[in-house]
Amino acid sequence: MATIDKHSYAHMFGPTVGDRVRLADTDLWLEVEKDYTQYGEEVKFGGGKVIRDGMGQSQASCFDTVDLVITNALIVDHWGIIKADVGIKEGRIAIIGKAGNPDIQDNIDIEIGPGTEVIAGEGKILTAGGIDAHIHFICPQQIEEAQMSGVTTMIGGGTGPATGTNATTCTSGPWNIHKMLQATNDFAMNFGFLGKGNTSLPLALEEQIEAGVCGLKLHEDWGTTPASIDNCLAVAERYDVQVAIHTDTLNEAGFVEDTMAAFKGRTIHTYHTEGAGGGHSPDIIRACGEPNVLPSSTNPTRPYTVNTIDEHLDMLMVCHHLDPSIPEDVAFADSRIRKESIAAEDIMHDLGAISMIASDSQAMGRVGEMITRTWQTANKMKQQRGPLAPDTERNDNFRIKRYIAKYTINPAISHGISHEVGSIEVGKLADLVLWKPAFFGIKPAMILKSGFIAAAPMGDANASIPTPQPVYYRPMFGSFGSAAAKTSMTFLSQAAIDQGVPEKIGMTRMVGVCKNTRNIGKKDMIHNNWQPKIEVDAQTYEVRADGELLTCEPATELPLTQRYCLF
């Protein structure tokens, strides 16, 4: 039997079981847990390679074969870290397993035929597209910026650089909702819009849900009172949509206890739950211990560094229309920025008490850095806290699964779209991102929407090959013409679909329904469901979880920074 040495095998077909891979310049290492490809029967495309007529490619028609196969990919998802071929059919993940030609090979799950395109996944990491569930839709240019970072779904609200949108993630009222649905029709990105949830009577909320939002947003700048919270959640319960909340920093209408009492045990997504992005000062972070609260962070505080505190004050003044010449406005800003709770936030992510990370795009957060800052946080915690049980010094598989869940499956579950997106699982949209390991978390190698290439780094279009400089991120064919709409989905409430909103306003893209948002809780946040009792000292701002003080030093240096961003 012919053999090949480990180094040559990894170079040719990618890593296999027991091999370890470093994630970019971090201290995080993954180890391959399982390999679905068969040694000696691997498929690979190229001159003199396997995927040729009568060899790895069968004679079968498109009815029996996949449209696209990603060969020898290293899948990193919440459910595992495995090596496999991935077959994609009609825009969805059809099979994860072994690809080839069943006429001459045994145990073939994915049949390759003349109608099958190939993407070489050997030596690359494959992840689900990121889901950013805290978007201020301030400018359309955010969409391309997010896409090029590996994000394929954006959930939030807004209408452009309006004063309300600069501060709050709300698309307010049916007319604005319809305009945003129309404006985003032709982008290669999935969308979900949040209506304004701040009112104490139901009618204005019902009409927004029926107009096409996938959820509602309560924001303190519109008045997040106990009455509006109760009303908003009551309407959401009837329509099966999610509610996101930015609570009352100034404690004008009540304290954190009053807000949590107004929840009445109903499910809610708490934005920037640490508090620097807004929320009851100084103890909104206590919400992380509640069984009905789905907590998230936004990326300006991710991770805690020596620069975090200084940069926040100016950001806050701009985003919330505050005046630095008014002492009360300055005091408002100062009350939100607490190094003690930001330090605790790092540790709460590492222990799974905070379930999600999002951007807060152009409203204190950076839309193209959600994924990067997630892995910077994971790396900081590895350096400061060591392996995360059950991990050992050999690999960080559990920590990697915990952190990738924060921007993929958990926001999908929270907003009722996990049946369509959020993980690499059969039946879901093939919204996928390929990464070279050396660039993982910061520079994707390729972004696919429904199995069609939407964006990638590309060299000089007049060159003789694809790679000559200047190489930079460019939209690909999946971002043009009607293909962008036909490979992308907008998530609406079932009520809006029943009202015929897509047809009435001329939407031509795929439409998905958000569902199962009211019967979930913290327990459903994969790898991130710890519910400690959180206590905050009102004088020192120290944070304790189940009696243990949560604190850490700010980072002075981070991975995934300057060495990747010279141009």
Curated annotation (Swiss-Prot):
Cofactor: Ni cation
BP GO annotations: urea catabolic process
Molecular function terms from GO: nickel cation binding; urease activity
Enzyme class of the recorded protein, top EC level: hydrolase
Compartment(s) of residence: Cytoplasm
Domain Urease: residue ranges: 129-567
Reactions mediated catalytically: urea + 2 H2O + H(+) = hydrogencarbonate + 2 NH4(+)
Catalytic activity, EC: 3.5.1.5
Complex formation: Heterotrimer of UreA (gamma), UreB (beta) and UreC (alpha) subunits. Three heterotrimers associate to form the active enzyme.
Catalytic site: H320 (proton donor)
Protein name: Urease subunit alpha
Annotated residues for binding of Ni(2+) 2: K217, H246, H272
Pfam families reported in the protein's UniProt record: Amidohydro_1, Urease_alpha
Binding locations of Ni(2+) 1: H134, H136, K217, D360
InterPro entries, A to Z: Amidohydro-rel, Metal-dep_hydrolase_composite, Metal_Hydrolase, Urease_alpha_N_dom, Urease_alpha_subunit, Urease_AS, Urease_asu, Urease_asu_c
Similarity-based family: Belongs to the metallo-dependent hydrolases superfamily. Urease alpha subunit family.
Keyword Hydrolase appears in the UniProt entry: yes
Pathway recorded for this protein: Nitrogen metabolism; urea degradation; CO(2) and NH(3) from urea (urease route): step 1/1
UniProt modified residues of type N6-carboxylysine: K217
Keyword Chloroplast: no
Gene Ontology CC terms: cytoplasm
Cofactor detail note: Binds 2 nickel ions per subunit.
Residues reported in the UniProt entry to bind substrate: H219
Modification comment: Carboxylation allows a single lysine to coordinate two nickel ions.
